Amino acid sequence: MKDSPQVTVLRLGHRPGRDERMTTHVGLTARALGADKVVLANAARNQADTVIDITDRFGGPFDVASTEEPKRLIRDFEGRVVHLTMYGEPVQEVEADVREANTAEPLLVVVGAEKVPFEVYEHADWNVGVTNQPHSEVASLAVFLDRLFEGRELDREWENPDRVVVPQETGKRVVDPDEE
């Protein structure tokens, strides 16, 4: 988000045939809730295209990249690393420290898909759990980003959209930005 060092979300792993929607939703959630970039495993090319298409239609800025070496990205990242895992420290106990670190350094938020290698736990500055119960990695990412940005992401202004959603009490309304 503006006024702070970059926040990048890394989708660690992607199981074709099993993770299509979940990987897409990790990217869309990262975009909608304040991250600056998502990095997906190369096997997730279609999911990357979907996130790029949404960004083109509904505004940005938001970057999408892919990697064949996600563990190397974690190891070589120049900033702090947060790994979202149900086994981590409770988000409410570490969020202030993570937020403070992100005032000075970029942040890489790692979201797993398949079994996460132990070295990811070791390289993370924080292993963070949202409830320490099994649930969706998309839910964990959403809660974590909301805690990180303290709700500021909900008021974000999107640049250069082709379409704008007009909030309604009932019904749906999507318009050209000039009609808003």
Swiss-Prot record:
Molecular function terms from GO: tRNA (cytidine(56)-2'-O)-methyltransferase activity
Keyword Cytoplasm: yes
Disulfide bonds: none
InterPro entries, A to Z: Alpha/beta_knot_MTases, tRNA_m1G_MTases_N, tRNA_mtfrase_aTrm56
UniProt binding sites for S-adenosyl-L-methionine: 84, 112-116
One Pfam family per UniProt: Trm56
Lineage: superkingdom: Archaea
Keyword entries, A-Z: Cytoplasm, Methyltransferase, S-adenosyl-L-methionine, Transferase, tRNA processing
CDD domains: aTrm56-like
Gene Ontology cellular component list: cytoplasm
UniProt-annotated location(s): Cytoplasm
Reaction catalyzed: cytidine(56) in tRNA + S-adenosyl-L-methionine = 2'-O-methylcytidine(56) in tRNA + S-adenosyl-L-homocysteine + H(+)
Gene Ontology biological-process entries: tRNA nucleoside ribose methylation
Keyword Heme in annotation: no
Entry EC number(s): 2.1.1.206
Function: Specifically catalyzes the AdoMet-dependent 2'-O-ribose methylation of cytidine at position 56 in tRNAs.
Family the entry assigns: Belongs to the aTrm56 family.
Subunit-structure text: Homodimer.
Cross-referenced HAMAP family: tRNA_methyltr_aTrm56
Name of the protein: tRNA (cytidine(56)-2'-O)-methyltransferase
Native source organism of the sequence: Haloarcula marismortui (strain ATCC 43049 / DSM 3752 / JCM 8966 / VKM B-1809)
